[in-house]
Structures are given as C-alpha cells and as structure tokens.
Curated annotation (Swiss-Prot):
Gene Ontology, cellular component aspect: plasma membrane
Organism field: Alcaligenes faecalis
Protein name as catalogued: Phosphonates import ATP-binding protein PhnC
A Pfam match: ABC_tran
Gene name per UniProt: phnC
InterPro entries: AAA+_ATPase, ABC_transporter-like_ATP-bd, ABC_transporter-like_CS, ABC_transpr_PhnC, MetN_ABC_transporter-like, P-loop_NTPase
Enzyme class: translocase
Entry GO MF terms: ABC-type phosphonate transporter activity; ATP binding; ATP hydrolysis activity
Membrane topology: Peripheral membrane protein
Length: 276
C-alpha cells in the first residue's frame, strides 16, 4: 500500500531532518509515530504527500512513486491521501459546509471550484459526514465560531471527503484537552476502520498512542529507532526514542498500574515528553 525507501530530507543549512527512513504500511493498518520534538515526525508525514520535497528516496503509494511525479500526476495521486492537521487548516471565514466541500477540490475543474459548485452527490456526502462526526446541523456555522474539538472534527470530515486510501494525521490532539483528545482519537480510528483506510498518526502523547494504535514507530534525530507493537513499549524503548529518564510513571499508566498518588507525576512526565 505505502512503501517508503531510504527517505532523506536535508536543508540548505546542512541539517538532516530525515536520515534514510524505511517504512511500509499495509492496507487498513494504523500506525502511531512518536518521538521528541525535532525528530522529523511532521517532516516525514509531509514528505509522503510532498508538502515538503524529499531530498532523496522513494515513496510508493499503490506502486506509484510519489517522489518523482510531475505536477499533474501528483495532483491526481494526492486525491488518495487525506491530511488532518494539528492547527485544523480551515478557512476561518467560510462555513463548515464550505470547508468540507473544499475536500473535493482535487476532483473538480477550475471553474466549478471557483464558483463553489459541487455535485448533489458531494453535498449528500458532506451532510452524511457531518452527522457521522457529531456536527449535524452545524453546516452553516462559520469555522471561526467553532471550538477546537469541533474544528478538528471538521478537518477529519474534510479529509474523508477526498475518499482517500491513506490518512496522514499530524498531531490531531496537541491543542485539545484530555477528554476531547480521546474522543478525537476514537473517532479517527473508527472512521479508518469503517472506510478501510490506512493511517500514519503523529502523536506526542505516548500513553494515548499505545492505547489506541497497535503499531508504533519511534523517530529520533531523523532515524527510525523503533518499529514494533505498542505492547512492547517499555522503559528501554522509551529511552532509545527520547533519551535517559525515569519512565516508570509513563509505563505504569500504559499498563494501568498507576496509583492515585502517582497521577500528578504521570501528568508531569507526559508534559515533559511533549515539551522535548
């Protein structure tokens, strides 16, 4: 489905954001991407659909090398990739419905897009997705009037408007409170299973990642240092990904053994991971 071979990204400063990343994602597979800030997680996701141009390597989606496509062919290939952003990437002055329908722009010609003319089928799909993500009746509300959780739900529905094969999800819970974060994660994974989608989800919360995602890939300094089941994440793996630290409060939360007196320490440790 998705095959990444020797993916590298270097900047003009000489900094290397990605160092020979090799990764495969099977149809319907859900993968969590974790690592410290600056590890290359967002860069990796953006290199897949070439929002960031890779310096070297191959990115194969259903056998087609995205890294070497011309502009027109890349536009066609991007139809199959849905993107969900940390900061939602909504047009604030537009309504929820208008933001959703923008997910169909890759299938529309210039003039229909310019005049915002969409097919009855697209409009029906938009209403159905709004209902599915819990925003029924909010189609005429402006994006800037929504809460953070509601905006993320619009972003999720917009990505599904593309009818993609693959979802790239970049920090979907970073700006959300713990309850909303769990709701959003459940929603994303439920929709992936309902639509048979594969997903790469960049997420800073290790406990949330291991709770919801069966496979975890850990990046450090642009290189993959762990690729395996969430159930195998322990203090040794966390040290390999993030560096030396007392990870007991995190691993206790992952295994459900945190006692009430340890909850504050666990929260502090989680914040420390996100800040690194």
């Amino acid at each position: 489905m998705l095959e990444i071979h020797n993916l590298q990204k270097s900047y003009s400063t000489g900094d290397k954001a990605l160092k020979g990343v090799n990764l495969s994602v099977q149809p319907g597979e859900l993968l969590g991407l974790i690592g410290p800030s600056g590890a290359g997680k967002s860069t990796l996701i953006r290199c897949v659909n070439r929002l960031v141009e890779p310096s070297e390597g191959r990115v194969l989606l259903n056998g087609k090398d995205l890294a070497n496509l011309g502009r027109h062919d890349l536009r066609m290939a991007r139809r199959r990739i849905g993107m969900i952003f940390q900061e939602y990437a909504l047009v604030e002055r537009l309504t929820v419905m208008e933001n959703l329908l923008s997910g169909r722009l890759g299938y529309s010609g210039f003039w229909p897009s310019w005049f915002r003319r969409f097919s009855p089928e697209d409009i029906r799909l938009a209403y159905a997705l709004l209902e599915r993500v819990g925003l029924d009746g909010m189609h005429n509300k402006r994006a800037d009037a929504l809460s953070g959780g509601q905006r993320q739900r619009v972003g999720i529905a917009r990505a599904l408007m593309q009818k993609p094969d693959l979802l790239l999800v970049d920090e979907p819970t970073a700006s959300l409170d713990p309850k909303t974060s769990r709701q959003v994660m459940r929603l994303v994974l439920e929709l992936c299973r309902e639509h048979g989608l594969s997903a790469i989800i960049n997420i800073h919360d290790v406990v949330l990642a291991t709770e919801y995602l069966p496979r975890i890939v850990g990046l450090r300094a642009g290189a993959v240092v762990y690729d395996g089941p969430a159930s195998a994440i322990d203090t040794h793996v966390l040290t390999r990904i993030y560096g030396a630290e007392d990870w007991s409060s995190i691993t206790d939360r992952m295994t459900g053994t945190t006692v009430p007196g340890d909850e504050q320490a666990a929260r502090v440790a989680t914040i420390a991971i996100a800040a690194e």
